[in-house]
């Protein structure tokens, strides 16, 4: 894979994931107790022996830069790297990134310097495990100009994706972005041609683009230069290229989740606790997911009842109930608490005992979850200070609310407590 250069698209402002993206880029959003979203595509690259990786981003990239710099340091005997390329204004390009294709176009001067055969374009907000070597080999074996990774999907969700029609060789013959009604029906394909059983094909009669592409080097350069007004791969570049280029497909029939919204992010995290078999597992020695080593002590559980949950490193839990939840590193939960169907991201630091004691004596709220608090169907961002006898339960069943001044939002019926928020004692949300 020495002839492959990976380009991970960090995405835009992350408005669908707000407020989790208020102070961080979308790829830097914490995941599964100890990881960040960017760790997924980068780990897939490393496990696929692709070690030349750029990450393109333009919003709130400080924490992403810090995470990548601390995590992905290849040895001095390797030429591998993972490097962030932030949007910048130049005399030739006075605007910020206008879309996925425009982001790559603005850095063509750098990307084209690499003597590679293929560019691998990836997204920074998907949860999946893929061996990109199989993807690139499919591209090479079919003499393709462009290859798209596609996913068989059922009709209920098909209109949320860019859909493809293909011939029996797997070549793309038509492309439609998020079709509805009759246009959706016309995009049905026989997925048994891709190895699905008749029963699976009947359930999943559509092929959806995953937003993951392999381009021949010169093909990508030519397409971006010939169409300077085209800013998006899925909506413009790929449909245009399908008319006169060999655009092939690679079927990925495994777990894949676009976690670009609060609802999908919440569900994907809690699905990791599902028994007996979660849809995605971080416990795979052959293809591990890497992240920054923190050298934290083991978690300490004092008289706790924990059911179907994931507890990160360095947590301190006292006489509490944890049910179907994910707790991030350094989470602290006091006695009498109930954490139910919740995602707690933990903390960036430990608060010394003397400081905690001083805050409690002065009726202030220390870091963590205070005694006798209930957190149900919620996301609590890092470094939140939740007081005693607080109830975060969305008691009025609100779907959407902006209470930023009070330290929380409600998105899709899920309460999201902001990073560094302080929720006073006896608050009911």
From Swiss-Prot:
This protein's pathway: Glycan biosynthesis; glycogen biosynthesis
Keywords: ATP-binding, Carbohydrate metabolism, Glycogen biosynthesis, Glycogen metabolism, Nucleotide-binding, Nucleotidyltransferase, Transferase
InterPro entries linked: ADP-Glc_PPase, ADP_Glu_pyroP_CS, GlgC_bac, NTP_transferase_dom, Nucleotide-diphossugar_trans, Trimer_LpxA-like_sf
GO cellular component: carboxysome
Mitochondrion listed as a keyword: no
Protein name, per record: Glucose-1-phosphate adenylyltransferase
Organism of derivation: Cyanothece sp. (strain PCC 7425 / ATCC 29141)
Binding residue positions for alpha-D-glucose 1-phosphate: 162, 177-178, 209
Protein family per UniProt: Belongs to the bacterial/plant glucose-1-phosphate adenylyltransferase family.
Gene that produces this protein: glgC
